[in-house]
Regions:
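A short Gly-Trp-Pro
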Residues: 2-104
Length: 104
């Protein structure tokens, strides 16, 4: 994700994984949360570790989807495809991805 919100919250572009409903069992009651409006004005809910504040999940109300931060995975080889989202509007000017490499 290249969006301004992710860059400001994480400090750079991030890898996120869209979760299918019931794909993983995460006890959200053990996580801290905060809500804010994203760049589009839609509500975004962030879930983080209460001990170290590491980001765990993001919920985007507009799409009714949960996203897991890929950095949480021990084995990233299970990931099959990658897409760059919000690239056109928000990417770093020094980071150019060719049309062939860009999947949106």
């Amino acid at each position: 994700c290249h969006c301004v919100d992710c860059r400001k919250k994480i400090g750079g572009i991030i890898s996120i994984i869209q979760l299918r409903e019931n794909a993983v069992d995460i006890d959200k009651s053990k996580l801290g949360t905060y809500e804010h409006s994203g760049g589009s004005g839609n509500k975004i809910k962030k879930f983080f570790c209460k001990k170290c504040a590491a980001p765990i999940l993001t919920y985007v109300s507009k799409w009714d989807k949960f996203y897991l931060y890929a950095g949480m995975l021990d084995d990233v080889s299970i990931l099959k495809s990658a897409y760059n989202i919000f690239y056109e509007d928000s990417h770093f000017p020094f980071m150019e991805i060719s049309e062939r490499e860009l999947k949106t």
